[in-house]
């Protein structure tokens, strides 16, 4: 029996908890309840209870009904605990339920008041407080119930403060203001510093915030209530009271305080003091320079300047101004700033981003001439000791950015080991205002690969090797879709913006019509034939122009050479470097005796073959074949060819290892020998694969190359 009672009490308590958390419209259906709005509260409703009240505002009779249920002892209990008439406590005018004997949901919905007193809102008029953002306004709280709690936050525009004035105050009085009170805090929350706490009916002096926000809290306890309070607020500034005298202008600062900008003849924090009119004496121009009046009223009698006069200073050629460029005559008769001086100096020479500059400590240099030696011998050691030579004075005065003192030395070096310097490594500022030596520049080091010999070239990453790609205009061999890129040739990078390539690679077959630059691109830093293998180290560069040699013959492939100008500079690194261009006088041996290394990718490789993913840049050594022998060799195979002076033939060197088939690889030919710029071996571009009739890579027929030596001057002219 006791267990059943406790279970029933628990269920009833759970029902009461559910009442407060129900949504406005119920969805649970209990057929035993009188109305759907009650079905979650009771077991089996059988009766109702009538609550009769008097509205405190207009004194009319109002009320509502709630259902009642029979308990186990057949006693009638209300289905929920209700506060009776206190729900109308703060209403100015009340709403009325259908309490004349019909069940309703009036109490459940919570809209008891038809009208609230000023400052209150909500269905029971018990809610108050808000966030106020306005230049002025009011806070009005008409009467108040017990245990009320209201908060207002007032925000002003930046740079303004808030002033709060109480128009009416009627609260329970206490010396400590601990029962019913209004508390004003600086800031926008209850953590701010308390400015004032008020109660009773004595209005305080106007309250002002230090910042742009103010927090107002109203609190009432559980006994006694009065008429409430009425306060007005407005945005003000420190300049609102016009604190400046003599028509001075009040200027606000970021902290919210003010400063007075005084008219001429007045001074003081509030422009309260009258100044005697003063003048400034002529400051004069600096040595090796001059002055000009550039503003204000100017000079009086050519010797004194009126207050507000602005003087600008300038220096003669090869001198630089150190100090204030302008000075203004102030109201105290003094010039602003300090008098500048003109110093011998040099403007720093412009350098490229590839050059690193370092300013050396200033040391006055000295020279000895035969005349110095004559004077040293003519005077005794004693006289020299009695009249010691003074050390030259070091430069003084600060210079504007971009200038250096006389005798300053600048040291230059390249920012990367892949570049070499041209011009002077050290330059000195001369008395003429110019710099000694020649302007430095850094250019990429060409043809340098560490520890590489000609016979052992397989598996090398040739950093000047450029892959030339063309965009398809239709289906190609059934494996490329429209717009895909495919490898057509190899070229040679000769500087950061120039690639040398065979002309037939960038023209329509058998014609001199050049392919559109938008349908060509250059890939640098590539090693694997598969385009997906080197994507982190490669550079994909667009082409701005194609320069075809004017003597190019698309039938005989004579002068088969062209230049690609890159739209963007190549980034020089371990994987991307240019190759050198050679002249005939640079060759230590005859051209026919040279062992030439050829490198390139297999442009005819099948992307579906198993080894395609691991196929890399191929290289091998070839030997030059006499031109007449090359022609006869082709005639023996029924192929009449003409080898011009702009070509050379070569075939694979049988004594050197090789993994290249020149007939399948549009590559470049290079030779390593010491250059003029460095005694170390450098790789030089000698040729470009032009044509071959060897279809089986049997090496019975030589491959023809475009000889680069005759075109060296033409290439260098177009590299600039």
From Swiss-Prot:
The disulfide bonds in this chain are 128-150, 177-199, 239-250, 244-260, 262-271, 280-329, 315-342, 414-442, 489-505, 630-649, 661-697
Give the primary localization class: secreted
**Annotated ranges, domain Peptidase S1:** 445-720
Signal peptide range in chain numbering? 1-21
Pfam families assigned to the protein according to its UniProt record, in alphabetical order: CUB, EGF, Sushi, Trypsin
Q: Which residues form the EGF-like domain?
A: 235-272
The UniProt entry, under SUPFAM superfamilies, shows:
Complement control module/SCR domain (SSF57535), EGF/Laminin (SSF57196), Spermadhesin, CUB domain (SSF49854), Trypsin-like serine proteases (SSF50494)
Instruction: Tell me the function of this protein.
Output: May play a role in regeneration of skeletal muscle.
Q: What is this protein called?
A: Inactive serine protease PAMR1
Please give the organism: Pongo abelii (Sumatran orangutan)
The gene from which this protein is expressed is PAMR1
